[in-house]
Amino acid sequence: MNLQGKNVTLHDMSLRDGMHAKRHQISLEQMIAVATGLDAAGMPLIEITHGDGLGGRSINYGFPAHSDEEYLRAVIPRLKQAKVSALLLPGIGTVDHLKMALDCGVSTIRVATHCTEADVSEQHIGMSRKLGADTVGFLMMAHMISAEKVLEQARLMESYGANCIYCTDSAGYMLPDEVSEKIGLLRAELNPATEIGFHGHHNMGMAIANSLAAIEAGASRIDGSVAGLGAGAGNTPLEVFVAVCKRMGVETGIDLYKIMDVAEDIVVPMMDQPIRVDRDALTLGYAGVYSSFLLFAQRAEKKYGVPARDILVELGRRGTVGGQEDMIEDLALDMSRARQNQKVSA
């Protein structure tokens, strides 16, 4: 693999995807410390919202320590060069949330849908572009469909006004060949002016390899998170990825030592538990399950006595997708009752 001379824009997820790992309980002080540290290290883009995007505050997804607006207004005025993005899932976030984010100073709106449901993004992508934002179409759980189907959905988002399309490995399921195929087809068939991005999870330990494959295939934006702070086994650990890019001659514009220090001195002490490929996170990747389901399944294990691993495998078998968190408790209860009935009949 020869990536010498390529340029890539890195996008930090630790203050959005990392919200899942923190049960959305990141304080304003922590948010500011991480964001300003990343800014000083040269990170060009930082995502800040509830883990499930703008408007995610709910019983289903979790109540954050502060509102999206409070986080955005606390952080954005303190940044010197980094720009801030906000994730928006139609059906959770609204056009009013989008306008609020832009009013706070957000420059990039990333409109996320399940990989087969790009059509629900038309209103939000169109409004974002009309209001002058850098507008990204974000196709989640992209491992579930073929490269041709990803392209079909990407073309819809592009037609609505997205200037960047993301192939998103929400489950950490993909291997490099699949990433290469999907990113390569997007790069070959979309408008040359449309940027291509990749968002990986480390559930199978493949996030760095997959991100490199994405760059080789034509991606110019890569998501990750400092210290890997994110759902499941986390996102592509950016301090590691920056080091790999430096060795391979890929220009990121990031100061390696500074981002290492943000990871070690600020983010790791914030963690409620180590972000690693444990058996439950590995099961997410192996079964192709949405990464933010991990803590929900672990809580259900404690409540109903059904191993999280078994719950996750069944969720994968049923083809559950992001937004179906409410099914996890129902499934765990059903599995618990079924096991009790088996014991009685035995």
Swiss-Prot record:
Enzyme class: lyase
GO MF term set: 2-isopropylmalate synthase activity; 4-hydroxy-2-oxovalerate aldolase activity; manganese ion binding
Sequence positions that bind substrate: 16-17, 170, 199, 290
Entry annotated with the keyword Nucleotidyltransferase: no
Pyruvate carboxyltransferase domain span: 8-260
Keyword Nucleus attributed: no
A Pfam short name: DmpG_comm
GO biological process: catabolic process; L-leucine biosynthetic process
Site (Transition state stabilizer): 16
Keywords noted in UniProt: Aromatic hydrocarbons catabolism, Lyase, Manganese, Metal-binding
Residues that hold Mn(2+) according to the record: 17, 199, 201
InterPro entries in UniProt: 2-IPM_HCS-like, 4OH_2_O-val_aldolase, Aldolase_TIM, DmpG_comm, DRE_TIM_HOA, PYR_CT
EC number: 4.1.3.39
Catalysed reaction, written as an equation: (S)-4-hydroxy-2-oxopentanoate = acetaldehyde + pyruvate
Catalytic site positions: 20
Record-stated family: Belongs to the 4-hydroxy-2-oxovalerate aldolase family.
NCBIfam families: 4OH_2_O_val_ald, PRK08195.1
Protein name as it appears in the record: 4-hydroxy-2-oxovalerate aldolase
Organismal lineage: Bacteria, Pseudomonadati, Pseudomonadota, Gammaproteobacteria, Pseudomonadales
